[in-house]
Swiss-Prot record:
Protein known as: H(+)/Cl(-) exchange transporter 6
Keyword 4Fe-4S: no
Phosphoserine: residues bearing it: 773
Its membrane topology: Multi-pass membrane protein
Location (main, coarse): membrane
Binding site for chloride: 157, 489, 576
Taxonomic lineage of the native organism: Eukaryota, Metazoa, Chordata, Craniata, Vertebrata
Length: 869
């Protein structure tokens, strides 16, 4: 497999998940990205490993296929359906656990503080009430921060990490049991601590962890939990279950099983088929109805009523029976919705821009410092948020008249929604029959505040709504990214709902549009702002429709989200894509830009290969594995034929051979071409060295300077054949000699063969080599042994390993002339990790990895392409 070396790849100074990486600790940030032209700065990047989504069809796998019949196939499929159902049920139970304790802690906190405020408002001891609120919030946030110290990947919503995992990037620790425990417990405390975060977004990450861990029936964190379960021992199977778990998390959070399925398709999975669609939808349904069953029973005491489908419920949107002029929305309102979509996109782009700058500041000034600094930052955010909420509720609120009518439906669910709206009204410092509008929004759980904006018949002051929006916008932006488990869906919905309600108030009070329904504008405002932040369209439309249970909102929500996305995309990316980029994850988008088709596979591949032979000595394998970090190696043989004799005496044959040679791309030729292009596009290292020698070297020596530098940088390939002797004077053709490609073998497979003693003596036939079954090869999944932990004294370096039974003899390959768009589509849709480039005569000339298809790498190659035209 190919690595990327800074001296050879002038367009790219960093190494990626599948290429050669520099030695560093996982916590260390290294400057790996290029200078960003729009910001003129270098972003820190990390090395990431890719996942093996491509199936390795080797001899052990074929042996399993030989024993497979229709009966076993049906049993395997039945087990998969049962596992999918279990994932949905467990995800629903996780949501139930989170919701129960968040409600418990929040009610306890607000109950104590509200009682204190009511008593101290007359005694003049409001400072004591503020201290009580600070005590609750700081304690909860401190506990949430401690849990993130235990498992740092539990911070945030986890959606960017899950998106990367489904895209094929292995994010360390993302789907571990310890991560799930820290995530679930941490989100309890962060939400109860009054931070402007939510519990619904982290449900996606929690569901993904359940989906990844449950089918394995074992845990790294709890090593005693070990079951001999023979199924689903590959990244390919785990990816499908993670997709189902992520969809189940969305379904449990919003009561939207179809929206969850579309979310998994739109935002995550790069590979999809009809069978997976049914399983993901079934998993989402299982999660929704599990949560619905238990929540309805616990809150209403009516088991089996299924009245609370998700953690977040918007209630029923319905005009008052006494208002005959009211309509949920009209055709004329669509114009206002489009304008709101534009404003929502602008606000979302502003939010993302500010949060990106904050994230960069944290990466440079907070994360490199001791971990205690992260805890202190979280406590500072909690302190400021608590003071702002308390002071704004006490000082900036206005007393508004309570509505004389209530929207009470015929069903118990709508009655519950109405009771929640009425019971969450806060009357701080207001006379009878009035309420404090600012305190009603700030001194309630976010879900209750959203219901107030959606369904409260009473009015909110435009000044209050504007102040609430500004304060909430800034604090939510500051909060997202601190070291606590958090989410952004509900804060964005609440912020957008305030914006929409403000628009409705302005239209009613100053333009005289009395027919409009304020709840509709609050919903559209919520959709506009959320769409401007996350840039989701299809899945978010369905999620909001399912949450409102009102299909007539389909058109305005879809139009608003599309306009918000188009507006926001003009300025920057969505919030999750921004954080993926800041982490340096080599995420592959859905497709490449049209301009990239000017490049071909030969332009982006890595010709400097590290390879193995079909029969290789143990000493050579150990040397290769210990001196490189590549995750796959081409299995090759050398071409030693001499075609010069055939070219004598027959002009026809001579011309045919010359044509064949001219049409076949070789690694030496490609390397020489790149060496020439580097003279016109030198790296700083080459430029400095050239400057040092420019005065003393003769013209002939100048031309060979780059060649000499490149040859000195690379040591000859390890000697694997006894009749070859290493030479420091190898030419480019000798170093990049033709190699016939036979297949790919993974690092994990080679290490497994060495650990299990799969080899044979030189005096024996390769048939005497022990054979491993498919189950034995996958026994150590997902954490295979490391070559550096291998006891070399137990190995005979002269023994030979026959890798041919265990290599993949038929991986996907491309021609050197394949356009980049074709390479990209094949790589992404098939979930590949390595893509060999093979010429017309079966010789491998390079290899393409995820790194070679990232936007930064392709842009750099395109610039180099323009330089050489």
């Amino acid at each position: 497999m190919a690595g990327c070396r800074g001296s050879l790849c002038c367009c790219c100074r960093w190494c990626c998940c599948c290429g050669e990486r520099e030695t560093r600790t996982p916590e260390e940030l290294t400057i790996l990205g290029e200078t960003q032209e729009e910001e003129d700065e270098i972003l820190p990047r990390k090395d990431y490993e890719s996942l093996d989504y491509d199936r390795c069809i080797n001899d052990p796998y074929l042996e399993v296929l030989e024993t497979m019949d229709n009966k076993k196939g049906r049993r395997y499929e039945a087990v998969k359906w049962m596992v999918v159902f279990a994932i949905g049920v467990c995800t629903g139970l996780v949501g139930l656990f989170v919701d129960f304790f968040v409600r418990l802690f929040t009610q306890l906190k607000f109950g104590v503080v509200q009682t204190s405020v009511e008593e101290c408002s007359q005694k003049g001891c409001l400072a004591l009430s503020l201290l009580e609120l600070l005590g609750f919030n700081l304690t909860f946030v401190f506990l949430a921060s401690l849990l993130v110290l235990i498992e740092p990947v539990a911070a945030g919503s986890g959606i960017p990490e899950v998106k990367c995992y489904l895209n094929g990037v292995k994010v360390p620790g993302i789907v571990r049991l310890r991560t799930l425990l820290c995530k679930v417990l941490g989100v309890l405390f962060s939400v109860a601590g009054g931070l402007f975060v939510e519990k619904e977004g982290p449900m996606i990450h929690s569901g993904s962890v359940v989906g990844a861990g449950l089918p394995q029936f074992q845990s790294i964190s709890l090593r005693k939990i070990q079951f001999n379960f023979p199924y689903f021992r590959s990244d390919r199977d785990k990816r499908d279950f993670v997709s189902a778990g992520a969809a189940a998390g969305v379904a449990a959070a919003f009561g939207a099983p179809i929206g969850g399925t579309l979310f998994s398709l739109e935002e995550g999975s790069s590979f999809w088929n009809q069978g997976l669609t049914w399983k993901v939808l079934f998993c989402s349904m299982s999660a929704t109805f599990t949560l619905n069953f238990f929540r309805s029973g616990i809150q209403f005491g009516s088991w089996g009523s299924f009245q609370l489908p998700g953690l977040l419920n918007f209630g029923e949107f319905k005009c008052s029976d006494s208002d005959k002029k009211c309509h949920l929305w009209t055709a004329m309102d669509l114009g206002f919705f489009v304008v709101m979509g534009v404003i929502g996109g602008l606000l979302g782009a502003t939010f993302n821009c500010l949060n990106k700058r904050l994230a960069k500041y944290r990466m440079r000034n907070v994360h490199p410092k001791p971990k205690l600094v992260r805890v202190l930052e979280s406590l500072l955010v909690s302190l400021v948020t608590t003071v702002v909420v308390f002071v704004a509720s006490m000082v900036l609120g206005e007393c508004r008249q309570m509505s004389s009518s209530s929207q009470i439906g015929n069903d118990s669910f709508q009655l519950q929604v109405t009771e929640d709206v009425n019971s969450s009204i806060k009357t701080f410092f207001c006379p009878n029959d009035t309420y404090n509008d600012m305190a009603t929004l700030f001194f309630n759980p976010q879900e209750s505040a959203i219901l107030q904006l959606f369904h409260q018949d009473g009015t909110f002051s435009p000044v209050t709504l504007a102040l609430f929006f500004v304060l909430y916008f800034l604090l939510a932006c500051w909060t997202y990214g601190i070291s606590v488990p958090s989410g952004l869906f509900v804060p964005s919905l609440l912020c957008g709902a305030a914006f929409g309600r403000l628009v409705a108030n302005v239209l009613k009070s100053y333009i005289g549009l009395g027919h409009i329904y304020s709840g509709t504008f609050a919903l559209i405002g919520a959709a506009a702002f959320l769409g401007g932040v996350v840039r989701m369209t299809i899945s978010l439309t369905v999620i909001l429709i399912e949450s409102t249970n009102e299909i007539t909102y389909g058109l305005p929500i879809m139009v608003t989200l599309m306009v918000a996305k188009w507006t926001g995309d003009f300025f920057n990316k969505g919030i999750y894509d921004i954080h993926v980029g800041l982490r340096g994850v080599p995420l592959l988008e859905w497709e490449t830009e049209v301009e990239m088709d000017k490049l071909r596979a030969s332009d982006i591949m890595e010709p400097n290969l590290t390879y193995v032979y079909p029969h290789t000595r143990i000493q050579s394998l150990v040397s290769i594995l210990r001196t490189t970090v590549h995750h796959a190696f081409p299995v090759v043989t050398e071409n030693r034929g001499n075609e010069k004799e055939f070219m004598k005496g027959n002009q026809l044959i001579s011309n045919n051979i010359k044509f064949k040679k001219s049409s076949i791309l070789t690694r030496a030729g490609e390397q020489r071409k790149r060496s020439q292009s580097m003279k016109s596009y030198p790296s700083s290292e080459l430029r400095n060295m050239c400057d040092e020698h420019i005065a003393s070297e003769e013209p002939a020596e100048k031309e060979d300077l780059l060649q000499q530098m490149l040859e000195r940088r690379y040591t000859p390939y390890p000697n694997l054949y006894p009749d070859q002797s290493p030479s420091e004077d190898w030419t480019m053709e000798e170093r990049f000699r033709p190699l016939t490609f036979h297949g790919l073998i993974l690092r994990s497979q080679l290490v497994t063969l060495l650990v299990r003693g799969v080899c044979y003596s030189e005096s024996q036939s390769s048939a005497s080599q022990p054979r491993l079954s498919y189950a034995e090869m996958a026994e150590d999944y997902p954490r295979y042994p490391d070559i550096h932990d291998l006891d070399l004294t137990l190995l005979n370096p002269r023994m030979i390993v026959d890798v041919t039974p265990y290599m993949n003899p038929s991986p996907f390959t491309v021609s050197p002339n394949t356009h980049v768009s074709q390479v990209f589509n094949l790589f992404r849709t098939m979930g590949l990790r390595h893509l060999p480039v093979v010429n017309a005569v079966g010789e491998i000339v390079g290899i393409i990895t995820r790194h070679n298809l990232t936007y930064e790498f392709l842009q750099a190659r395109l610039r180099q392409h323009y330089q050489t035209i």
